[in-house]
UniProtKB/Swiss-Prot annotation:
This is Large ribosomal subunit protein uL11. One or more lysine residues are methylated. GO terms for molecular function: large ribosomal subunit rRNA binding; structural constituent of ribosome. It comes from Pelotomaculum thermopropionicum (strain DSM 13744 / JCM 10971 / SI). Forms part of the ribosomal stalk which helps the ribosome interact with GTP-bound translation factors. The lineage of its organism: Bacteria, Bacillati, Bacillota, Clostridia, Eubacteriales. The keyword NADP does not apply.
Length: 142
């Protein structure tokens, strides 16, 4: 017989730097999960992606055990890293903060493809370009 799911918790945590402090502790503590076990396993799995924020979906079962799935980093985080930005533009329509070649957008789209609701790489690229536009990043040919 399969375990019964008690809750699904979604968090965005820096790779390799999860701690029992907020937001991880309170989110898992209220479901009775062993927080240190999650933190240790998450940090081991994401150590190679240091510096990125990794979304994680934690499934908590009624017997207080858990499983989790890590997703790809948010498009905005990948775009900021590719453009070398600390923060995006506060006024994306007026103030452009960077230019990014279409080849970089394609790389990001290929990385994000498993988590995007897109049928083709071109559709995924359009989604990433839309995110870039809303951040004040211009997409240039190249």
């Amino acid at each position: 017989m399969a375990k019964r799911v008690a809750a699904i918790v979604k968090l965005q945590v820096p790779a390799g730097k999860a701690t029992p402090a907020p937001p991880v502790g309170p989110a898992l503590g209220q479901h009775g999960v062993n927080i240190m076990a999650f933190v240790k396993e998450y940090n081991e799995r994401t150590a190679a992606q240091a510096g990125l924020i990794i979304p994680v979906e934690i499934t908590v079962y009624e017997d207080r055990s858990f499983t989790f799935v890590t997703k790809t980093p948010p498009a905005a985080v990948l775009l900021k890293k590719a453009a070398g930005l600390e923060t995006a533009s506060g006024e994306p329509n007026k103030k452009k903060v960077a230019k990014l070649p279409r080849s970089k957008v394609k790389e990001i789209a290929e990385l994000k493809m498993p988590d995007l609701n897109a049928a083709s790489i071109e559709a995924a690229m359009r989604m990433i370009e839309g995110t870039a536009r809303s951040m004040g990043i211009d997409i240039v040919e190249g």
